[in-house]
């Protein structure tokens, strides 16, 4: 008994010393690892600032290995993989985050939203939508609905897009009325292609009553009525557009003049176009519509001169020269095609968002997928 007591007394200090040494070793190891993690993290940030994405990824991978429980490092690494186009690795990082049992509800929602973004970028729209649907009822619900709206636009699911736009507007994320009008116009265009003209007509007539600020709805309604030999109704639709969305009149100036003449309302159309010209910047489309109403060639050419007094225009100058007799026929044959080629790019429309140029007017930019990003002006007039 005495021997056991003496052994115990000697053993306690030894055990304490060994424990202290072990703790010091673990503490030093922990400090070393914690020192490595911030260094790797800041090194990754430095590479990011220098736009060295590959080196930044390597640094963040090292930081994650040294500190695997830090969710922010995982988010940074996953987002880097996505920006680099390495979607498989981005998905794995965010799925690994979601599998962690210690993740808070907020971080779990963030990880699921990031995962949905990975799927979106990879073109896996079904999986992206499934991930976004699971964010209903979370703080990221509105962001998820915006992403779902983008999916429905890409898949041309206009009914779902319309429903989502109304939910977003109800949530106070701004006005989606014009966007909603575009969705309904797309549906009307589809109905017309399928020969369901009556349904398309009803849809557009209801639309201009609900959202009269939609220039596209008025234009499509006028075009559909005209195709049904309803010239009076088509003319009325164009007048409605001019009343509610006057800035878009240049898009329909030609049809206003053409249909107005057919209905015997040349003077009314001329007065309307002249009044618009006095209140807005010079528009070549409006000038050409006024020219089409003139029977006298000299009076028509005078309209181009009036346009040039208000706004220098190579296109207007070319059209004015086109009606004049100058030089020999051989000289005219040489000069006129050159002028026309020089004017051609100036007649195009240009997206204000991405700069995509097109000969026709687009309501939805084929380049950046923005709605209403084309001003109703030619490039020369911008």
Please describe what each predicted stretch is.
Residues 47, 81, 119, 152, ...:
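Residue at a conserved register position within TPR or TPR-like alpha-solenoid repeats
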Residues 73, 107, 111, 144-145, ...:
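TPR alpha-solenoid repeat register
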Residues 68, 102, 106, 139-140, ...:
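Short coil turns that delineate tetratricopeptide repeat
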Residues 43, 77, 115, 148, ...:
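Structural register within alpha-helical repeat arrays
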Residues 33-69, 76, 82-86, 92, ...:
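Alpha-helical segment of the N-proximal tetratricopeptide repeat
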Residues 1-35, 130-133, 137, 142-146, ...:
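Long, contiguous interaction/recruitment modules in multidomain scaffold/adaptor proteins
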């Amino acid at each position: 008994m005495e021997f056991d007591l003496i052994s115990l007394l000697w053993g306690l200090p030894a055990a304490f010393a060994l424990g202290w040494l072990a703790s010091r070793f673990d503490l030093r190891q922990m400090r070393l690892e914690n020192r490595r993690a911030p260094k790797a993290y800041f090194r990754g940030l430095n590479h990011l600032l220098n736009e060295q994405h590959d080196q930044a990824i390597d640094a963040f991978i090292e930081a994650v290995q040294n500190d695997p429980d830090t969710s922010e490092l995982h988010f940074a690494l996953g987002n880097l993989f996505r920006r680099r186009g390495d979607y498989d690795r981005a998905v794995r990082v965010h799925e690994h985050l979601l599998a962690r049992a210690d993740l808070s509800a907020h971080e779990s929602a963030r990880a699921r939203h990031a995962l949905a973004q990975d799927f979106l970028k990879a073109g896996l729209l079904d999986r992206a939508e499934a991930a976004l649907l699971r964010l209903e009822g979370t703080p990221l619900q509105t962001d998820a609905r915006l992403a779902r709206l983008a999916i429905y636009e890409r898949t041309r699911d206009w009914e779902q897009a319309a429903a989502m736009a109304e939910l977003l507007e109800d949530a106070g994320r701004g006005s989606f009325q014009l966007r909603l009008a575009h969705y309904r116009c797309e549906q009307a265009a589809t109905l017309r292609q399928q020969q369901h003209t009556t349904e398309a007509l009803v849809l557009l007539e209801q639309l201009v009553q609900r959202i009269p600020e939609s220039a596209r709805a008025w234009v499509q309604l006028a075009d559909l009525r005209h195709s049904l030999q309803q010239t009076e109704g088509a003319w009325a639709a164009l007048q409605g557009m001019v009343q509610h969305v006057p800035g878009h009149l240049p898009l329909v100036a030609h049809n206003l003049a053409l249909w107005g003449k057919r209905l015997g309302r040349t003077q009314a159309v001329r007065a309307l176009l002249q009044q618009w010209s006095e209140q807005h910047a010079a528009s070549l489309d409006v000038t050409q519509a006024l020219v089409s109403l003139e029977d006298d060639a000299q009076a028509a050419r005078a309209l181009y001169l009036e346009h040039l007094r208000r706004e220098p225009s190579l296109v207007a100058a070319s059209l004015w020269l086109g009606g004049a007799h100058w030089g020999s026929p051989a000289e005219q044959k040489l000069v006129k095609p050159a002028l026309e080629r020089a004017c051609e790019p100036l007649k195009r429309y240009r997206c204000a968002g991405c700069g995509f140029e097109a000969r026709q007017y687009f309501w939805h930019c084929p380049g950046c997928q923005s709605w209403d990003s084309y001003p109703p002006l030619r490039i020369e007039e911008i």
